[in-house]
From Swiss-Prot:
UniProt cross-references to PROSITE patterns, sorted A to Z: RIBOSOMAL_L23
Function: One of the early assembly proteins it binds 23S rRNA. One of the proteins that surrounds the polypeptide exit tunnel on the outside of the ribosome. Forms the main docking site for trigger factor binding to the ribosome.
Gene Ontology cellular component terms for the protein in this record: ribonucleoprotein complex; ribosome
Assigned keywords, A-Z: Ribonucleoprotein, Ribosomal protein, RNA-binding, rRNA-binding
Protein name: Large ribosomal subunit protein uL23
Self-association and partners: Part of the 50S ribosomal subunit. Contacts protein L29, and trigger factor when it is bound to the ribosome.
GO biological process: one example: translation
Amino acid sequence: MEARDVILRPVVTESSMADLDDKRYTFDVNVQATKTQVKKAIEEIFDVKVVKVNVMNVKGKLKRQGRYAGYTKKRRKAIVTLSSDSNEIKLFNDDQQ
């Protein structure tokens, strides 16, 4: 699996933004990706040193449209902890002109 196929998108929530101070970043990853694949992909894409990877599966939520019910897609989140001497990951453009 290619590195760009493993990491799908960053997760932007209040909790994940608070973790940025501790060099912990949250990403949605491929549901078949393992911890080692996530670690290698983050190190390859962002050129940083990963210390720890925590992975969790998120079940799909029940959604209704009138009398019809269905589920949203299941997903997998990875919380990546960087080493203290590693550079930060630039998730957003800070170029304010």
